[in-house]
Amino acid sequence: MASNVDKFSSRFYLNVNKEELKKEYVGKTIQQVPTPGFVIDEAIFEKNCNRMLDRASDIGVTFRAHVKTHKTIEGTLLQLGDGRTKAVVVSTLMEGFSLIPLILEGKIDDLLYGLPVAKSRLPELYELSKIVPHLRLMIDNPKQLDILREFTSTLPDDAKPWSIFVKIDMGTHRAGVTNDSQVVKDLISTILSDKSLFDLFGFYCHAGHSYASRSIDAASEFLCAEIDAANTAAKFATSIDPSLKLTLSVGATPTAHSVSPKVKELLPTLSGKLEVHAGNYPMNDVQQMITKCISQADVADYVFAEVISNYPGRNGEPGEVLVNAGVIAMSRETSPEGDFGIVITPGFESFYVDRLSQEHGILKSKDPKATLPDASQVLCIIPNHSCITAAAFPWYYITKGSDVITDIWVPWKGW
């Protein structure tokens, strides 16, 4: 018997092709395509990008766009704002290499690889450094300098020095060195002692713990702490070499949202040029809503899933709902309330993702009088962490202010 399986959406997973996907889906509504899927409202995405660029320019600082949330050419172009910035951060080399078309067009001229260097990836970083005018590396351990020195000894004599951001840990306790440690002083001194090999570009701070903010004012306090930490390191560096022209790069999406004119007052006191960086802000998610730095109207993305069963009265009223989006589609990131995402479909806003298995989720309602959605109902769910949720999907359905699909974005995969 002849099979027609190649007419279904599963065929696109084997060879994700933007143009073929557009032919299949553009013009359809979200209710007309297979579930689960990931949607980005391009109008909100662009508005968020422009607002962030405006914040930076209004106070006279530069902006560096982190592309790791969406991992697409289309999203990156919106973050760059038609030449308003040419500086980016990437979390993977796949992101870096995928941006080469924009580098060759002159739209990107400054690229930071946002992890401390790994020895196994240095050959790729070196090749990338030949393409982008300014490749920046992140350093937070003396061993990384040894690795760079060893690798550079294998390169041609005319290899340019490595441009370096020293990562400062100002409370998040992921990567970075603290200003009260001897390590940071040794790192700076070592970098400055060999200018044929290293070029100290500046200091980088990321207040990941600013997601604990519950107001713009609270986020602003974290931003000031980021600036102070970067400036403390810069003051030590300039005490060794007063001629240094340093960049102080600070930001997380909550702190970047809190950039205000009062930051401008700090600029003359700093031992370097201030740069703001952020990545989640074009899309946003539940965790950003909880900071109170944005509203639901600023969230550009959601997962759409389909009700496949419901269970009236189970585990309390009104019961529970089974949808075809689980851990892989939603991620295991929880909100402070313990849920995994919130439903925004009109009529079902009281529902939230209560628990997850690999490929299905269980929804509950905060309202015991709510009506359970029936099987086949499509629900839109804002994820807790859009960066991780988006990474699960092979393509994104793009809309502009409605549920009609206007484009397809295909994200880069791998490391």
From Swiss-Prot:
SUPFAM superfamilies: PLP-binding barrel (SSF51419). It catalyses: D-serine = pyruvate + NH4(+). CDD domains: PLPDE_III_DSD. It is an enzyme of class 4 (lyase). One of its GO terms (biological process) is D-serine catabolic process. The modification N6-(pyridoxal phosphate)lysine is found at residue 68. Homodimer. Belongs to the DSD1 family. Catalyzes the conversion of D-serine to pyruvate and ammonia. May play a role in D-serine detoxification. This is D-serine dehydratase.
